[in-house]
């Protein structure tokens, strides 16, 4: 059942903060055919999907390129949602409805969705084979994929989205070449505050680029692209001094050390007066970063839907391995290399790593 976006947000945040953090499949009152325990019989099918994804799609539960692709897909699918278009009498998009798979012939032609065809087709096959909706599958695959990356929060997973959808309107996906105002306006239309935009960008902790500069294919956005941690927020604030490729790519800025790619939109958001203090607050605590990202993702996952009409199957989601490493300023650099942009708060005390300036390899 579709519902107004704004009528569900309070329940979303409460639900996200109350999520269990234990292992998947435990503590439920229903025993599935495979012997797993869960809270609701509607969740049993997802154990089969879990095994399929981890074995085949994630190639043995790895935190590699398929995880980064699903993080793009989950955002690009859900953000196709515009109350402003609806108010103007146009179709505003269905939100997290799986339309990027159902209508891939249209949505994969959007410039922002370049390079996703193979991943979309692999997900389509999984959805059809297991008889689950594409909207549910995208959310589930995202939560499972992140569980393969140390330090990741255990995301909420709600099932029950219909497989009925329409193609998303074009031009609703904010991109790396947009201004901060354009990004905040687009995200604000979908119901997200500037703080929540910064929170959602925690996904870039696991990110690399493929289509912005082909000469440095899969160059990561931080020094730990297989760990969900605050390094992305720290390193985006470092002074840009290095051109990692033979020339700068589309929407690329100078980076702090060889091999790291810096998106222009990230650099701008880290330094803009509307977002800089929230950005700085994400640098020093992996726990805070995870909590905020989980809440923002829970909100995004129900864009266009009534969360009360969905079934909570979060207990199927595995828990990621903990990340106990403290945030650091990379070797060869100091706090003096940070471009502090929040005037109201001092920059947190963060240790400096020993050793030379990093030189990063492409992300796997």
Swiss-Prot record:
InterPro entries from the UniProt entry: Ccp1-like (IPR044831), Haem_peroxidase (IPR002016), Haem_peroxidase_sf (IPR010255), Ligninase (IPR001621), Ligninase_C (IPR024589), Peroxidases_AS (IPR019794), Peroxidases_heam-ligand_BS (IPR019793)
Pfam families, per database record: peroxidase, Peroxidase_ext
Cysteines engaged in disulfide bonds, as pairs: 32-44, 43-313, 63-149, 277-342
Keyword Secreted: yes
Organism superkingdom: Eukaryota
BP-aspect Gene Ontology terms: cellular response to oxidative stress; hydrogen peroxide catabolic process; response to reactive oxygen species
Signal sequence coordinates: 1-20
Residues at the catalytic site: 76 (proton acceptor)
Catalytic activity as recorded in UniProt: 2 a phenolic donor + H2O2 = 2 a phenolic radical donor + 2 H2O
Gene Ontology cellular component terms for the protein in this record: extracellular region
Positions annotated to bind Ca(2+) 2: 205, 222, 224, 227, 229
Keyword Ribosomal protein in annotation: no
Glycosylation sites: 163
Binding locations of Ca(2+) 1: 77, 95, 97, 99
Keyword terms: Calcium, Disulfide bond, Glycoprotein, Heme, Hydrogen peroxide, Iron, Metal-binding, Oxidoreductase, Peroxidase, Pyrrolidone carboxylic acid, Secreted, Signal
Top-level enzyme category: oxidoreductase
Residue(s) carrying Pyrrolidone carboxylic acid: 21
Record site: Transition state stabilizer: 72
PANTHER family: CATALASE-PEROXIDASE, THYLAKOID LUMENAL 29 KDA PROTEIN, CHLOROPLASTIC-RELATED
Family label: Belongs to the peroxidase family. Ligninase subfamily.
Protein name: Peroxidase
